[in-house]
């Protein structure tokens, strides 16, 4: 069961990391008024954003296959957040697609609104859904989790663009990324402090444990170190440290969940897993597919690893 618990959280982490910078690009898109810069932003993630959404499908599929009771409770208890997240993804996806259908300024403005709003609300609602998963109905921790995912998405989006665009634009994006980093780290500290003070979801003891404290300290170190790298213009290194932040966030979620898998009801991983026969069947069928998907993503990001030149990728 623990292997599948790790696989489910791995898929969630891959989605938060990869589609997270797409969301960040969408939010930073709102800061651009020059049409050429906007086209550059769209070109930055255009080849990969459809593929990145595979991971949210993988997360849902794995959760349903291995822990169907958790899947049903998570959606039943949070159906409005889940529905809002899906609607936000639709808006985020339709905006760039419809933008090119008509050469009309008003049309482009409306499609840009759809793209930007979807890019903001998708991580916000996904973060709130994760907060409800962890802390139940505690309002402030849930809201802070959503805002934290928005902030870290801006960090990864800014770092991704800075690593792939011209120096002049990269220096502007650096300011947004550093500001979002400080907001994210501050938000994490406030969130965990709130959990300790209110014992939201019964997670106070877990938050005060040594492993969780170590992950939080590492996140602060990585975030501040990334900001220093950004100020020095080492954008590739900044991107690596920025992508480490949502990775560490996912590890933190896993640590706060385990050994339960649905804290609001106290459901344990070993209690929620399907029967051994079904689990073995899912393992035999599922893990080769997961390895194939990982190989495909390695190939995809290798092809589009170069800088953006104009409205496309260079070599």
Predicted regions and their residues:
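Membrane-interface helix-loop-helix junctions at boundaries between adjacent transmembrane segments
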Residues: 72-83, 91-149
């Amino acid at each position: 069961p623990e292997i599948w618990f790790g696989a489910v959280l791995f898929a969630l982490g891959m989605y938060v990391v990869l589609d997270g910078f797409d969301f960040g690009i969408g939010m930073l898109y709102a800061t651009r008024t020059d049409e050429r810069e906007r086209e550059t932003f769209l070109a930055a993630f255009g080849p990969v954003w459809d593929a990145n959404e595979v991971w949210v499908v993988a997360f849902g599929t794995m959760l349903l296959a291995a822990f169907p009771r958790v899947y049903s409770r998570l959606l039943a208890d949070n159906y409005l957040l889940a529905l809002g997240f899906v609607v936000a993804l639709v808006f985020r996806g339709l905006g760039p697609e419809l933008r090119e259908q008509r050469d009309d300024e008003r049309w482009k403005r409306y499609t840009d609104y759809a793209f930007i709003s979807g890019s903001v609300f998708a991580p916000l609602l996904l973060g709130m859904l994760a907060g409800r998963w962890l802390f139940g109905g505690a309002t402030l921790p849930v809201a802070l989790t959503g805002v934290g995912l928005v902030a870290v998405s801006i960090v990864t989006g800014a770092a991704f663009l800075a690593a792939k665009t011209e120096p002049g634009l990269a220096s502007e994006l650096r300011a947004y990324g550093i500001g979002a980093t400080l907001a994210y780290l501050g938000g994490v500290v406030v969130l965990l402090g709130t959990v300790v003070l209110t014992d939201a979801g019964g997670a106070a003891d877990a938050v005060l444990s040594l492993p969780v404290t170590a992950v939080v300290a590492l996140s602060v170190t990585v975030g501040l170190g990334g900001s220093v790298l950004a100020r020095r213009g080492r954008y590739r290194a900044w991107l690596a440290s920025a992508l480490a932040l949502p990775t560490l966030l996912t590890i933190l979620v896993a640590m706060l969940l385990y050994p339960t898998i649905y804290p609001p009801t106290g459901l344990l991983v070993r209690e929620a897993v399907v029967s051994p026969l079904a689990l073995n069947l899912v393992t035999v069928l599922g893990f080769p597919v997961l390895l194939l998907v990982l190989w495909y993503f390695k190939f995809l990001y290798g092809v589009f690893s170069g800088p953006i030149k104009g409205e496309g990728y260079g070599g």
